[in-house]
Amino acid sequence: MSRIRIAGTQDQPLWDDFVLSQGQGGPYHLFAWKRAVEQSYHHETRYILSESDQGTVLGVLPLVLIKPPLLSSTLVSLPFCDYGGVLSPEREVSRELLEHASAMAASLNARLELRYREPAPEVSHVCGLGMTSQKVRMLLDLPGDSDQLWGSFKSKLRSQIRRPQKDGLTFTMGSHDLLDDFYTVFRVNMRRLGSPVHARAWIESVLDAFSERARVGVVYSGDNPAAAGIILICRDTATVPWASALSEYARSSPNMLLYWGFLQHACACGCSGFDFGRSTPGEGTYRFKEQWGARPSPLYWYGKGLPDSGVPAKNGGNLRKRIESVWSTLPQGVVDHLGPLVRKYIPL
């Protein structure tokens, strides 16, 4: 027999031990993501676990309720990242967790959205959700050390990595001590891209919650930050959820040094895999990650109204481009204030 219940703070050790034991478990499944969401954006969380009569965890499903003012709510697994979804080695347990999530979404009058890094047809069968797969993660296998990795690169890539170093740029790894410099780069770059920026408090909460698993990397030109990113370590994989570079330093390619620093760190931590994060096939970030040898791995997002197709709606894409165009022209101070107020309700 098994039972399903909502996990509490006291369940973090059990939850995390289970996540770390599962091949599909990643940093976003950890309890740290729940803590960061609650601490910074104050969203309600529903972390569901299935356990045996003896208290053994059989499966988990992390969920966050996004309730924007005047708009419909979304119960999502998980927001602000690439994937979440059910973790369980047992098909029946997975089905029970999905049924529970579907009933919960109905009781909350919320749209259910579940994100996976592998196909999960049971989501469509149990919850009646459509699927889209227009985004991919870019993954790179890592050798035993960074010297071997360097030797595997083509000469052109090695030259691109050396370029910022020849221009005097330097890479530094830290934590909260580099948060201000990270956020300086991040907020300016998000405005350039036409996207509302996450609150500084969100990034700080991620660093707080993930502790030693999270690190900040910054590339400097003199005393000025030119590129910056966050890296998370979970099991044998290093993941980069956010990275940015300032356009005025583009000639020196600081992002090349940033990612090389992250790759060295991942190798030093004993990681065998590197997740460059989400991209759209064929776009600029996809090609940037591809040059490192990364291969695409499709993401599978399930939700009401989603087509079983990787093709986004044309009109929706055009509207988004218009909004991005307008946002990028607003004064930096305006988007710095408005961005976090909007971004907390955008689960992407």
Residue ranges and their predicted role:
Residues 2-54, 61-71, 117-251:
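A conserved beta-strand-loop-helix scaffold within acyl/acetyltransferase catalytic domains
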Residues 43-45, 107-111, 269-271:
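Short, high-confidence coil segments that cap the C-terminus of an alpha-helix
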Residues 47, 65, 119, 123-148, ...:
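Active-site/acyl-donor-binding loops of N-acyltransferases
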Residues 49-52, 60, 68-70, 81, ...:
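Aromatic (often tryptophan-rich) hydrophobic motifs at membrane interfaces
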Residues 76-83:
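N-terminal cap/recognition module
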Residues 78, 151-160, 314-322:
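Short intrinsically disordered coil segments
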Residues 86:
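Active-site phosphate/ATP/adenylate-binding loop shared across adenylate-forming ligases
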Residues 94-95, 105-117:
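Short secondary-structure capping/junction motifs at helix and strand boundaries
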